[in-house]
Amino acid sequence: MDTSLISIIIIAIALAMDAFSVSLTKGFTQKNLTKSQILYYGLFFGFFQFIMPVIGYICGTTISSFVSTVAPWIAFFLLLAIGLNMIRESLDSDDEYIMDTFSFKELTLLAVATSIDAFAVGITFALLNMSLLLPCTIIGIVAFIFSISGIFIGKKLGNYFGDKFEILGGAVLILIGIKILLGY
């Protein structure tokens, strides 16, 4: 399946919503982050959003020959599950991401946790026999930009919008899954 650039950008934005939400939280809970620490957030989130679809793709290619006839259904259910999980997590009231100080350990855990969805999208890319470099690069760049932007916006706006962006990201992934399913 040849996915258009617009679809790839939409997927990247949807995947970046978790990192954006976490970054918003960091912005309004850690007012003392330096510019270099903010840059680390962007780099870590961007890198893991880039690499996890690659890992998912590698895993997906090992099974794609067995499931090529059901690939659209698998893609749909993967994106549906990811989207619903993002929405469910956003409706939970606990603020699991809030911590008081900057640490690379925490940053790595947050970057991995927010990129698990990208791993599943990588499996979907493999099942749909998509190219990998352009989508992963766009996903990483968008996550980088959204992470840094989220921190700056969070510093200015506070806690009000965090969960709503994650709901939007989940809804977009579900809609993309439906689009993939209807395209076959």
UniProtKB/Swiss-Prot annotation:
Q: Which keywords label this protein?
A: Cell membrane, Ion transport, Manganese, Membrane, Transmembrane, Transmembrane helix, Transport
Q: What is its main location?
A: membrane
Q: Where in the cell is it found?
A: Cell membrane
Question: Can you list the GO cellular component terms from the UniProt entry?
Answer: plasma membrane
Any one Gene Ontology MF annotation carried by this entry is: manganese ion transmembrane transporter activity
Q: How does it sit in the membrane?
A: Multi-pass membrane protein
Residue ranges spanning the membrane: these are: 5-25, 38-58, 67-87, 107-127, 133-153, 164-184
- Pfam families reported in the protein's UniProt record: Mntp
Q: Does the keyword Transmembrane apply?
A: yes
Q: Which domain of life is it from?
A: Archaea
Family, per entry: Belongs to the MntP (TC 9.B.29) family.
Its biological purpose is as follows:
Probably functions as a manganese efflux pump.
Name of this protein? Putative manganese efflux pump MntP
Q: Which organism is it from?
A: Methanobrevibacter smithii (strain ATCC 35061 / DSM 861 / OCM 144 / PS)
